[in-house]
A protein has these predicted regions:
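A short glycine-rich, Lys/Arg-flanked "PGG" loop and its adjoining helix->strand segment in the class I
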Residues: 135-147
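Short catalytic micro-motifs in class I SAM-dependent methyltransferases
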Residues: 124-128
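A conserved beta-strand element that flanks and buttresses the S-adenosyl-L-methionine
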Residues: 121
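Conserved beta-strand/loop positions that form the S-adenosyl-L-methionine
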Residues: 59
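Class I (Rossmann-like) S-adenosyl-L-methionine-dependent methyltransferase catalytic domain
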Residues: 1-53, 62-100, 104-111, 152-194
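Local beta-strand N-terminus motif with an aromatic residue
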Residues: 53, 117-118
Length: 194
C-alpha cells in the first residue's frame, strides 16, 4: 500500500492528458457526468457562510484542482491551504496568489490559534488519515474553528451498498500498488463530536 504522502508527491497531482492522476483514479470524468459532478462540488457552497469572514481553512487543499473549489473562499479575506504535497501547494499558490496562506506540512504539527477560522472545509481527506488519528484531527478542527462556525467534512458512508459495488470496480480498474490507505468509521462514531 502506497502512503498518501508519497502518492501525492510522486504521482497524484501530476498533470495528465485529462486532468491529474488523482482525478483519473478517483473521479468520474465521463463527459456525461460533468454537469452532475460540478453541481455536487458546488453544493458545498450551501454550507459556507454567504457573508464569508476573515479566514477559511482548506484542510488537505490539494492544488484546488477545480474552478468550483475556488468559489469556496470568494467571501473570505484569506484561504489557508494545508497539504503535505509540495506539488499541491505550489499549484494552489498559482491559483490564489496573495489571497492564500500556505502550509506544506502535517496538519497535526501546525500550531493554529484557537477559535481562529470562520469556516473549515475538508474534502475526501479524513478517511485517508489513520483510524487512530481521525478523532484527534476532528477535535483539532473543532478547536481552531470559531464557535458556531461550519466545519464541512466530506467523508464516506461505510454502510452504503454502492461502496461494495465500487470496491469490485476499483479492484478491476486499478493496479493494487495504487491502493491508498482508506478507513471509514461507522456513522455513529461521529456522535462523539456533537
Amino acid at each position: 500500500m502506497k502512503s498518501i504522502k508519497n502518492f501525492y508527491n510522486e504521482d497524484g497531482w501530476k498533470n495528465t492528458s485529462n486532468n491529474s492522476k488523482d482525478a483519473e483514479l478517483f473521479e468520474d470524468l465521463r463527459p456525461s457526468a460533468k454537469k452532475y459532478v460540478s453541481k455536487c462540488r458546488l453544493r458545498i457552497l450551501n454550507h459556507i457562510p454567504k457573508n464569508g469572514g476573515s479566514n477559511i481553512l482548506d484542510f488537505a487543499s490539494g492544488p484546488i484542482q477545480y474552478n468550483e473549489y475556488l468559489k469556496f473562499s470568494k467571501n473570505f479575506k484569506k484561504r489557508h491551504c494545508v497539504d503535505f504535497s509540495k506539488i499541491a501547494i505550489d499549484k494552489a499558490k498559482k491559483k490564489l496568489g496573495s489571497k492564500g496562506k500556505y502550509y506544506c506540512k502535517d496538519f497535526l504539527k501546525i500550531n493554529f490559534k484557537k477559535n481562529y477560522f470562520d469556516c473549515v472545509v475538508s474534502l475526501h481527506t479524513i478517511y485517508h488519515i489513520h483510524k487512530s488519528k481521525q478523532a484527534i484531527t476532528i477535535k483539532k478542527l473543532i478547536d481552531i474553528s470559531k464557535k458556531d462556525s461550519p466545519i464541512i467534512i466530506v467523508y464516506s458512508n461505510p454502510n452504503t451498498f454502492i461502496n461494495y459495488i465500487k470496491k469490485v470496480f476499483f479492484i478491476k480498474r486499478h493496479i493494487k500498488k495504487d491502493k491508498l490507505y482508506f478507513f471509514c468509521h461507522k456513522n455513529n462514531w461521529w456522535q462523539q463530536f456533537s
